[in-house]
């Protein structure tokens, strides 16, 4: 048992350490500045109640991106100095964001300890590497992201910090080896517990899904499957779950070795960045003679996001959460007794609203940011939720969960084919989606992202959209000049949300233009990029007529896209003639 001491280090504040919707994200080179990470970590410890630090157990892990291993050692030494009793670390510092949430909620240490929170080292879907992005966020005892009351306190602390505590003589712990290393300091014993987090996570998944039913599907010669981890942390779970537990062929796994730079790619599961999977599923530009798999899915860097694909078919995230909600009770044992409610983020399409109305479920529309769903779940008001940015989840944890979404889809496909695995033709992903549209109508939906836009120009564009809302007659006049074939705007506002659980109000959550036929235009500035601003434009049109639900999405939305770009003066403000990404 090694002895360590505590050192007080003098420091000065850094500007801009304000945690966004998912923590603090900056370039690696910013985090590598002396004292930068330490200031943020100490500001977090200082923002927490004393009993969540002194004598407490905290988790420190992440998606394995570049600088994670250094950060784990720094945070561990600071935890020891601040009186933390135990630090739990995923082997090789790898733990998906949903697995961290599960570990906080479910894991009990050998000595009966439970975690009170976690430092998660991730910048999610942002690229990794020496010149790319790093991030850190703090999750609370419920397994969910710190609420604004805590992140505001953290930020306030970063502006006044003058010293931090660190145990510099605490040796680095070998995080590649599972086991407990014990030390002793001024306040008593301190343990570092390195463990394989996939064990806890798989155990939890088995309480939710019928693994035998999914295994029958995955081992059926008729069903083919492909999972792409984009070299993110999902790779640390994929083989255990899909191959060892569910019987899929190992060749069905793509890019499932976690890498510090995600193999030089962009670990964002969408049609632009998951190129290899998109090609394999028959959605790429090159035409291949190889028959695509029946089902494909991808994850982002920290495995909380998912993309679902059928053979030559893309499932929008907005449709995905609606379809899971519509089929959950019959297909997923965890939901067999019914859903408590459903929720979506404001920019997500209203497909879930229609399901909720038809099934008589409680429904909530919340700002972007998973913590808003967490409040509803803690209050027992919501079972399934999702957002258009490829995040889907349920109340089994307090984060979105990419592998959960894949298992949910496999459960639905297995249920639809339970008497059909020996038949001529399987019910496919495309069949399930088209049947859903026939029942509930279709929400044609697209998102245009303009990344790394000049922040000043982005703010001006948004301010102009707000000022236009004061006269809808002028807006409608303008729209008719752009396109005469779109409905009238009947309401326009800046979305604000009053939390039904704690009464807190979140303002300025996105600009909305709502049309008489149920169509919507939404404009948001994103808080998850590390440089410049990202403008996101969400364009949605509802079609109830089942004979018109089979059109190409971009073609169906062309009039509204035209209106959105001209109404916002996108090119004029940003200088961009096209978006960076279209989803």
From Swiss-Prot:
Positions bound to alpha-D-glucose 1,6-bisphosphate: 25, 124, 304-305, 368, 387, 389, 400
Catalytic-site annotation from UniProt: 124
Similarity remark: Belongs to the phosphohexose mutase family.
Modified residues (Phosphoserine): 124
List of residues binding Mg(2+): 124, 300, 302, 304
Listed name of the protein: Phosphoglucomutase, cytoplasmic 2
GO CC term (a single one): cytosol
Co-factor note (free text): Binds 1 Mg(2+) ion per subunit.
Quaternary structure and interacting proteins, as annotated: Monomer.
Known catalytic reactions: alpha-D-glucose 1-phosphate = alpha-D-glucose 6-phosphate; O-phospho-L-seryl-[protein] + alpha-D-glucose 1-phosphate = alpha-D-glucose 1,6-bisphosphate + L-seryl-[protein]; alpha-D-glucose 1,6-bisphosphate + L-seryl-[protein] = O-phospho-L-seryl-[protein] + alpha-D-glucose 6-phosphate
